[in-house]
């Protein structure tokens, strides 16, 4: 089964470490893997209070994480720590979070929704 790779020479920040654990577990599910298998692009996830960010690079079914945000991601999302925790634990739907203003998102929203299949514990 695929595993999330970490950009060479980097040690992930706390946000990246949390997401890697969740994504590694989710990618073991063939149905969830199939949803991202053909995706190509990058996604920035940022914690708004501290500015801590990670970038996911997805291509050909492989996922790589790196610290910090890149300049031009395909999609991005930003929320406070508590809301990111609620979203990643499955207690708050990413769609509801966007509609209620708890999550800022931009770029390719379809990609965000597809990637949420592996970034949320379910």
Predicted regions and their residues:
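Feature captures hydrophobic
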Residues: 1-122
């Amino acid at each position: 089964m695929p595993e999330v790779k970490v950009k060479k020479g980097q040690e992930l920040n706390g946000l990246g470490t949390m997401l890697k654990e969740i994504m590694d577990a989710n990618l073991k599910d063939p149905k969830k893997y199939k949803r991202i298998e053909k995706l190509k692009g990058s996604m920035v996830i940022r914690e708004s209070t501290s500015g801590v960010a990670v970038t996911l690079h997805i291509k050909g079914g492989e996922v790589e994480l790196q610290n910090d945000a890149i300049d031009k991601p395909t999609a991005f999302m930003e929320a406070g720590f508590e809301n990111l925790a609620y979203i990643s634990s499955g207690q708050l739907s990413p769609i509801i979070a966007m509609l209620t203003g708890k999550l800022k998102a931009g770029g390719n929203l379809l990609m965000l929704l597809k990637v949420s299949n592996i970034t949320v514990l379910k």
